[in-house]
Design a protein with these regions (language model features):
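Conserved active-site and SAM-binding loop architecture
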Residues: 1-241
Length: 241
């Protein structure tokens, strides 16, 4: 086995969550790696894992990997710089087995941003004009990044709607989340499944097996993002063994 990859319990480290609940899952994963002894270990998690109280958890992870014979590097990567039409920041743990004497890996991605207007689907899920969401959407202005911004600005500072991001034609789309709404700024509606699939870099013929497209994509790492990391692991590490 050349490498082992995991996306540890993301819900434990949601961005914006005040209290980070630490899980033993990552350490269970490391215990398995200790038995399998792969050349390379790759783990992925949300940005929140390197923020606040979770920093101590990260240090414990690095220490445990060191104890089982691995040197670990941590990278905060943005999918938008990796050929993915989405501003999705994720933390990657890359660990190499010490006995292989591999040099540290360097990850630097600077691909051209892909804006929503470059692939926008003409179809979308129309809003019900009788809903509060539609009435609030009508009050949007260019500087609003989410429905929450619109609500706060027009409803005396009320804090609501911040999980409903606007998708603007001249911007790289926000992170696809498993919940909330992804609202089009240009027309009164939410993103089509085709758009969500494109933004997540999934193939258009992907079989979601009846599950919500937004939920599946929101819980996944963009395949193209993973491919870019894997490519560098091959070039900088595996090809040198």
């Amino acid at each position: 086995m050349k490498e082992k990859k995991t996306g540890e319990k993301k819900k434990k480290f949601r961005e914006g969550q005040e209290k980070q609940i630490l899980s033993d899952l990552f350490f269970d994963f490391i215990d398995i790696a200790e038995r399998l002894k792969p050349k390379i270990i790759v783990a992925e998690n949300v940005k929140g894992i390197i923020a606040g109280n979770a920093k101590g958890y990260v240090n414990a992870i690095i220490k445990r990997l060191d104890e089982i014979g691995y040197n670990t590097q941590i990278f905060l990567l943005n999918a938008a710089t990796m050929g993915v039409p989405q501003r999705r920041e994720r933390v990657f743990f890359l660990a190499r087995r010490k006995d292989l004497h591999l040099e540290p890996i360097s990850l630097s991605f600077n691909e051209k941003p892909i804006y929503y207007k470059e692939f926008v689907d003409k179809k979308y899920k129309k809003m019900n004009e009788d809903t509060m969401t539609y009435k609030r959407w009508l009050k949007r202005i260019n500087k609003d990044s989410s429905l929450g911004d619109t609500v706060k600005r027009t409803e005396n500072g009320k804090l609501s709607g911040f999980t409903s991001n606007y998708c603007k034609l001249n911007e790289v789309p926000h992170t696809i989340t498993a919940g909330g709404q992804i609202i089009r700024f240009d027309v009164p509606g939410t993103l089509s499944d085709k758009d969500i699939t494109t933004i997540q870099s999934f193939p258009q013929d992907y079989d979601y097996n009846g599950q919500s497209v937004q939920y599946v994509c929101g819980m996944s790492v963009p395949p193209l993002m993973m491919a870019k990391v894997a490519e560098q692991i091959k070039i900088q590490w595996l090809d040198k063994l």
